[in-house]
Amino acid sequence: MKTRTAQRLAAVACLAFAGTSWASDAPVVTDAWSRATPPGTTVGAAYMTIQGGKEADRLVDANSDRAAMVHLHSVEEKDGVSKMRAIDAVEIPAGQRVTLAPKSTHVMLMGLDGPLVAGQTFVVTLRFAKAGEQPVTVTVKPATATDDHAQHQH
């Protein structure tokens, strides 16, 4: 008797949620990473994918214990020269995916407390206008010759 009752309750629960959207209320951050930096380098960047929640939101700030200053940056290319500039926010449309990537929009880390070493992790806390603060674990990947972040101009 108990088994049948449990089965019926499970079936009712499944029906109750059948039409429910499983989209998160808040943005969901995945694949957060950074490139390793050589000793003496004081800047780095963090990249990630942000999946918008049920409502549009804006990434408005970030901070990390690993850096004295953390800004949101975009990269513009003009006459073959890439130039970074600080931006106030990153729009996160409802239900849409936004990718922060090299040579594009990213989280800029300035005044690093030491090199970012491949295989290590560190935390960047993102602040969204609606969803509030969200700590994100960033994995440091090996550096490559094709994207030396320190070569960009500010």
Specify the residue positions occupied by each region the protein language model found.
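Bacterial N-terminal signal peptides that target proteins for export
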Residues: 1-10
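N-terminal signal peptide c-region/cleavage motif recognized by signal peptidases
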Residues: 18-23
